């Protein structure tokens, strides 16, 4: 248990996610034990990754990291409905005009390739709500990224990067997008 927890803590400290989303609950109704274990480990690692006394040998290579929240993506599947109206909701049913498909259609195509578990389902368009419940940290209210800095100020070199990006955007030529390559490289 400690070895796999150490691995999960390493990943959190290495990649420093602001949010962790689990697909399965910690209580077992999400299917087999691997599903439950993944949720339990994510919640334990949330706390352990921020604690310098947990897996201190890792700190030669990474630093402690406090993720803002762990969200469980609740579900209504197989007669088991864990969604509630007071949970945070995100509409994932948008349409991508560049791809000519809705995200529901893309998801259905991907599930149709998971042949070993019979996940093929009809595609759908239109509103499709996903529900989230905070299991660690705070529950978002207005946006999945509530309370999280999403500007370039989040990183040390951020102001310089922002200045460069702003300059590229201001000088972008829709007729000659290739002119931006040098600045991007």
Model-derived segments and spans:
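The feature marks non-catalytic terminal segments
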Residues: 48-185
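Active-site beta-strand->loop->alpha-helix modules in alpha/beta enzyme cores, enriched
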Residues: 1-55, 76-77
């Amino acid at each position: 248990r400690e070895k796999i927890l150490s691995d999960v803590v390493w990943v959190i400290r290495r990649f420093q996610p602001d949010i962790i989303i689990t697909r399965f609950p910690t209580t077992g109704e999400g299917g087999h034990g691997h599903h439950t274990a993944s949720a339990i480990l994510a919640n334990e690692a949330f706390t352990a990754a921020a604690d310098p006394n947990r897996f201190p040998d890792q700190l030669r290579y990474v630093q402690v990291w406090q993720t803002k929240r762990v969200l469980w993506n609740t579900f209504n599947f197989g007669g088991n409905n864990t969604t509630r109206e007071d949970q945070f909701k995100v509409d994932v049913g948008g349409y991508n005009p560049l791809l000519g498909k809705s995200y529901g259609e893309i998801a259905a195509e991907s599930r149709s390739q998971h042949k070993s578990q019979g996940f093929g389902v009809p595609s759908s368009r239109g509103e499709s709500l996903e529900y989230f419940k905070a299991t660690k940290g705070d529950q978002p209210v207005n946006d999945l990224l509530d309370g999280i800095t999403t500007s370039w100020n989040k990183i040390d070199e951020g102001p310089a990067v922002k200045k460069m990006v702003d300059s590229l955007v201001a000088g972008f030529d829709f007729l000659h997008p290739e002119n931006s390559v040098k600045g991007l490289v």
